[in-house]
């Protein structure tokens, strides 16, 4: 492909609304163009990378036995009402009516459609296991679309759905998809982690997220330095330690004037924050309340607490609600001397503490020398804190956890019978008895993965594509191509020989200064580059360079061609 016959509208300046690197570089390199908030056109260069990733996904889905179909983007409301998600999903679901006043939505996901297909078409145990997948454009009306393809409203997604006769068979299907996802991201050349995660609004019994590691990642994840354990920080498990010794101090009320935060109280009393207990009052928004206790230097994990209590929602109580239960404004809360009955849930770390500081439920007052059991009672001991760096691994002995930033690019769920039960998707077993189908669902953000690759692979000059996702494998840059026929002929020959070997090549034949060409090629990030110039060519050489920090080498054209072919075959050799 000649540069002059392709279309790459690069920008010199970064658009003002582009906040993260991937958004900036995708706009500047001419990969995408914004049409509306969170809605983008994939320009020719960007579409090539999108298609590359889609092909890898298709190959691995097919290898895992999944079957491709294509479901409609527009979905009827009655299916969502049947699954009970029409009311639950909120304003992110774009709803509209047709001319006959029938209600529809633009699909942000396809559990309802695929479950409807299954209950119509999958009638016997003989038809399972079966796994369907699609690559489809979806729409989710994000309240604040940002970061380009990272959090758009319209997006391309691969979603797959497995159907099995029972939980054990569903586990096998889940494992197949889990392994397929690992192969997909390995083939893309990405540094990633598969982490345990919460099931969120999709529901189900278990899930894993696939996270591309990047300093700009919105999600915090933890992984063990000694074993394969990894989890989203919201899901990461705490380890229950052995209980410490009994407290020795007497419970003493102390005056703490205007000291409302843990840091202020600890400093005032000359204690480490780990010697204090933080009390928080929370609500489910439906009249139920709880007081959560965590060590002063720890943070409450609201998701863990919500799941522990079986609540659908969780939120901080209002000042008036706090006053009703404690008689105190926020800043001086504690579990001792509550004014109304309130369930108290303490984190594992609190039960190991002795002689600690708590709020006295009075303005400017705290207690020192507090101890659980002796001074106040706890309703439940549970793992309810956020886990951090240095915490012990919950899976192995001796390992400690490290914290990373990650970008979620894939998610796999064990749905169980959540959708099949509500939508009556059943089959007949070997004995002719009707049974509920077990399901799994598996998603990959196509555009998001391409953007995450840029977040992980770039420098101050532009994108540094991993070869499998690059729009072109190699660029051949002809210097003074319009004036030097020998240079252009040699560049064309290299281009043709590489293409014949299956290498995707962009031949830069523009009438531009060398510096302009080099800057553009650094920006768009093509991994391999051969530069053909008159002086070097006269000596039988061309320049060969790798975008990822490689030094420029002078090689004979034949050697340069062989180097490119070898690197492409090594990185893009197909399904493994």
Curated annotation (Swiss-Prot):
Family statement: Belongs to the class-II aminoacyl-tRNA synthetase family. ProS type 1 subfamily.
Compartments in which it is found: Cytoplasm
Keywords, sorted A to Z: Aminoacyl-tRNA synthetase, ATP-binding, Cytoplasm, Ligase, Nucleotide-binding, Protein biosynthesis
Protein name, as recorded: Proline--tRNA ligase
Gene Ontology cellular-component annotations: cytosol
Xref: SUPFAM superfamilies: Class II aaRS ABD-related, Class II aaRS and biotin synthetases, YbaK/ProRS associated domain
Gene name as annotated: proS
Domain comment in the entry: Consists of three domains: the N-terminal catalytic domain, the editing domain and the C-terminal anticodon-binding domain.
